[in-house]
Swiss-Prot record:
Location(s) in or outside the cell: Bacterial flagellum basal body
Family, per entry: Belongs to the FliE family.
Key words of the record: Bacterial flagellum
GO biological process, one term: bacterial-type flagellum-dependent cell motility
Record's protein name: Flagellar hook-basal body complex protein FliE
Compositional bias (Polar residues): 23-56
GO molecular function: cytoskeletal motor activity; structural molecule activity
One GO cellular component, as annotated: bacterial-type flagellum basal body
Region (Disordered): 22-56
Pfam families reported for this sequence: FliE
Protein species of origin: Listeria monocytogenes serotype 4b (strain F2365)
Amino acid sequence: MAIESINAASVLPKVTLGETAKTDNATGAGNTFTQMLDSMSDTQSNAQTSVSNLLTTGEGNASDVLIQMKKAESEMKTAAVIRDNVIESYKQLLNMQV
């Protein structure tokens, strides 16, 4: 089982100074976020299946199951931080003086 690292620089689109905003970037970022959530869901499912298999049938290695659980936990914490940042940004937008 290989562990894949999450690299934020590869997820975010590259932007250069003076470049005008394109509408495609907004949908692209949304698709990237959706893909990240799908990946997180798959990781959670794999971890739950591994735990279930280890406890019921004894299949699998305890250290591999622990690694999968920690990976799933890390992805959940990352999603929670992103959620908190989005909510905080939204609150700041609401409080802006027009």
